[in-house]
């Protein structure tokens, strides 16, 4: 058993997180962690502190469902992976940073808009949005930046309609969101966060006098009006949904296109048999795992995991990109296989904090892939994969630009 109380720092704990050198493969350091025996390993964070990372699928599922691990980002022991997390500590918490029962109370206020039935009914609207932006991109072609002309605007418009946020303001909130999630220092992140908070505060004020559509309008008219939620809580909830609702799907779209184009046999099989699309989406989610630093927790009690002791107060990070490449769960885990059953991947997390918007993300990705295969059958990258500039490991994985041609 490893006793972290007597050995709080180890000399061989690698730096975490690491940057990808390939859009769809693990960083070398992550592969080494995965291939090292045991489900838990010590890593060193940017501030010199150490934390546990969870690298095995079974242990990851168990720990993500363990109530002794807290999601409280204001805890001094929370394993921050970047200086920007200091801005999170200084801000009102969205429900992603709350523990039960407060987490459940806040989440239930929004969940009706993300049920399977509700999202299934959005398919015609999502198809309209996807094809509308494809019309514009193709008209301006035969080259494009797939991120700015398609991958980013599609989920931005979809989440705007769902929340009731005016899409006319997309340039502002896309820029502020990007600054927040990609900031390398706390002050820049806090400034971006405050910019978004100010915008949403103004929108709430508007909805109090002129009832608004969408989820935000409903929360203003109901929960805010009757005191179930206060203004700062509403702002933080709306901010979380707005950012997560467009940043993650935009990144998944871009990386999915890169990955499929770089695996032509897999892409050809998908074009030939569209019944494979839902399964291919699950495999891409497993394979790419773009939110691979989202599983940060802090232990509130001692937890023993396969001979390792996580002490109360220690940071734990479930790295879903590594757990999704567990060879005991997935055969040949570093290979893309659109025919495999990847449904039990951890790209959306697990337990009470499992991604609220996962049904919407799946729908958007299915519609996007089908539309691209139908309407841009000759789509290809305009530069070699090796020349693409990848985001660092401290943020949502992806690219900020994706030159394509057809």
UniProtKB/Swiss-Prot annotation:
Function statement: Involved in the metabolism of vitamin D3 (calciol) and of a number of sulfonylurea herbicides. Catalyzes the two-step hydroxylation (25- and 1-alpha-hydroxylation) of vitamin D3 (VD3) to yield its active form 1-alpha,25-dihydroxyvitamin D3 (calcitriol). The second reaction is the hydroxylation of the C1-alpha-position of calcidiol to produce calcitriol. It can also hydroxylate vitamin D2.
Chain intervals with Low complexity compositional bias: 1-15
Gene3D superfamilies to which the protein is assigned, alphabetical: Cytochrome P450
UniProt keyword annotations, A-Z: Cytoplasm, Heme, Iron, Metal-binding, Monooxygenase, Oxidoreductase
Assigned EC number: 1.14.15.22
One Pfam family recorded for the sequence: p450
Similarity section: Belongs to the cytochrome P450 family.
Record: residues binding calciol: 81, 193, 236, 293
Gene Ontology annotations for the cellular component aspect, listed alphabetically: cytoplasm
Induction conditions: By herbicides.
Note: Two metabolic pathways exist. One is a conversion of VD3 to 25-hydroxyvitamin D3 and then to 1-alpha,25-dihydroxyvitamin D3 (25-pathway), while the other one is a pathway via 1-alpha-hydroxyvitamin D3 as an intermediate (1-alpha-pathway). Analysis show that the amount of 25-hydroxyvitamin D3 is predominant as the product of this reaction, while very small amounts of 1-alpha-hydroxyvitamin D3 and 1-alpha,25-dihydroxyvitamin D3 are obtained, suggesting that the major pathway is the 25-pathway.
Protein name: Vitamin D3 dihydroxylase
GO biological process: vitamin D3 metabolic process
Positions annotated to bind heme: 103, 107, 297, 353, 355
A GO MF term: oxidoreductase activity, acting on paired donors, with incorporation or reduction of molecular oxygen, NAD(P)H as one donor, and incorporation of one atom of oxygen
Region (Disordered), start-end ranges: 1-24
Enzyme class of the recorded protein, top EC level: oxidoreductase
Secretion signal, residue range per the UniProt entry: none
Cofactor: heme
Catalytic reaction list: calciol + 2 reduced [2Fe-2S]-[ferredoxin] + O2 + 2 H(+) = calcidiol + 2 oxidized [2Fe-2S]-[ferredoxin] + H2O; calcidiol + 2 reduced [2Fe-2S]-[ferredoxin] + O2 + 2 H(+) = calcitriol + 2 oxidized [2Fe-2S]-[ferredoxin] + H2O
Places the protein is found: Cytoplasm
Record gene name: cyp105A1
Alphabetized InterPro entries for the sequence: Cyt_P450, Cyt_P450_B, Cyt_P450_CS, Cyt_P450_sf
SUPFAM superfamilies the UniProt entry points to: Cytochrome P450 (SSF48264)
């Amino acid at each position: 058993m490893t006793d972290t109380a007597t050995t709080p720092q180890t000399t061989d704990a690698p730096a975490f997180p690491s940057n990808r050198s390939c859009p769809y493969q693990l960083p070398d350091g992550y592969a080494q962690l995965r291939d090292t025996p045991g489900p838990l390993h010590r890593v060193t964070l940017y501030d010199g502190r150490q934390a546990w990372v969870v690298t095995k699928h079974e242990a990851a599922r168990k720990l993500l469902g363990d109530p002794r691990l807290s999601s409280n980002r204001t805890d001094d022991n929370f394993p921050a992976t970047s200086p920007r997390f200091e801005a999170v500590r200084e801000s009102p918490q969205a429900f992603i940073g709350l523990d039960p029962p407060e987490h459940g109370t806040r989440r239930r206020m929004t969940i009706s808009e993300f049920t399977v039935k509700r999202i299934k009914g959005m398919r015609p609207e999502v198809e309209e949005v996807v094809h509308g932006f494809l019309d514009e991109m193709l008209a301006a072609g035969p080259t494009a930046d797939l991120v700015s002309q398609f991958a980013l605007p599609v989920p931005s418009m979809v989440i705007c309609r769902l929340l009731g946020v005016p899409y006319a303001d997309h340039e502002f909130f896309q820029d502020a969101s990007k600054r927040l999630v990609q900031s390398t220092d706390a002050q820049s992140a806090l400034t971006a966060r405050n910019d978004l908070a100010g915008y949403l505060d103004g929108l709430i004020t508007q909805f109090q006098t002129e009832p608004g559509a969408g989820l935000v309008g409903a929360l203003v008219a109901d929960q805010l009006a009757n005191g179930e939620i206060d203004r700062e809580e509403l702002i933080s909830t709306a901010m979380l949904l707005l950012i997560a609702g467009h940043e993650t799907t935009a990144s998944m779209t871009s990386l999915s296109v890169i990955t499929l184009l770089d695996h032509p046999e897999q892409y050809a099989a998908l074009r030939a048999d569209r019944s494979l699309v839902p399964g291919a989406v699950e495999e891409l989610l497993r394979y790419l795992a773009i939110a691979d630093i989202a599983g940060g927790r802090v232990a509130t009690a001692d937890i023993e995991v396969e001979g390792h002791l996580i002490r109360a107060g220690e940071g734990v990070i479930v790295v879903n990109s590594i757990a999704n490449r567990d060879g005991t769960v997935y055969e040949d885990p570093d290979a893309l296989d659109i025919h495999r059953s990847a449904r039990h991947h951890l790209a959306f997390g697990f337990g009470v904090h499992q991604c609220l918007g996962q049904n919407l993300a799946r729908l958007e990705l299915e519609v996007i892939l089908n539309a691209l295969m139908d309407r841009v059958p000759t789509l290809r990258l305009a530069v070699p994969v090796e020349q693409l500039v990848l985001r660092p490991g401290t943020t949502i994985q992806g690219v900020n630009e994706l030159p394509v041609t057809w």
